[in-house]
Amino acid sequence: LHVRDVLPDLIQCALMHVQFETIHPFLDGNGRIGRLLITFFLMERQRLAQPLLYLSAFIDAHKSDYYDLLQRVRTHGDWGAWLRYFLQGVTETATAAGQQARELHRLREHYRAQLRDKPNALALVDELFVNPYMTIGRAAQVLEKTHPTAKAAITVLEQNRIVRELSGRQ
């Protein structure tokens, strides 16, 4: 895995995943770790700038194929079918991630337009796309304003249905 340029990174990643799942080194969590290794490997190879490719949804949607193809590699050496499955998963997952990113961008721009005349609330919108958890204290910190000003900004976000209070404490 540390030798570059022998095989394309996605192919190496698919091979690595089968090897890890075959070894099955832990009593619990092998599946989660195996899927995380895909993301970490692609980040280490600088194929991902952020850990935004996680194949769990694809694997869950095609679970019987996943287990059947892993087994076929072990019993029949059928790497071709496994590689097609894996690359299809990467393609579908990357396409979905791209769509989600575009939707989030459109949503953020919609909120920004909605709040263009409310500078404090507008400043919090961008922060919400970094971390969607907001408290009045954190809002005051982000805005570098007082707690009453931060609370007023959050109230504007609530009135515009951008955030809602969940804790019962405000």
Task: Give the positions of each predicted feature.
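Phosphate/pyrophosphate-binding active-site loops
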Residues: L1-A101
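Hydrophobic, well-ordered secondary-structure elements that form the walls
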Residues: F86, A139, A150
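Basic amphipathic alpha-helical segments that dock to polyanions
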Residues: L128, A150-N160
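Short, Lys/Arg-rich nucleic-acid/phosphate-binding segment
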Residues: S167-Q170
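Short acidic, hydrophobic short linear motifs in intrinsically disordered regions
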Residues: A123-V125, V130-L143
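Short alpha-helical segments that sit at the start of domains
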Residues: A97-V125
